[in-house]
């Protein structure tokens, strides 16, 4: 499994933590996680949290 597939799997696994069940994730969401890791020096878990929190805030 490549890193991008792993990131997508992690994103999908944590959707329910943010009441985002049913939200369709895209490659742009994976890009956002990668940007968070590189730009803000976040761990994978923290980057996923930041992206999902951002999606949640936009939808609420």
Language-model segments: residues:
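N-terminal acidic leader/helix
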Residues: 1-22
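Short, charge-rich amphipathic interface segments used for partner binding and complex assembly
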Residues: 24-60
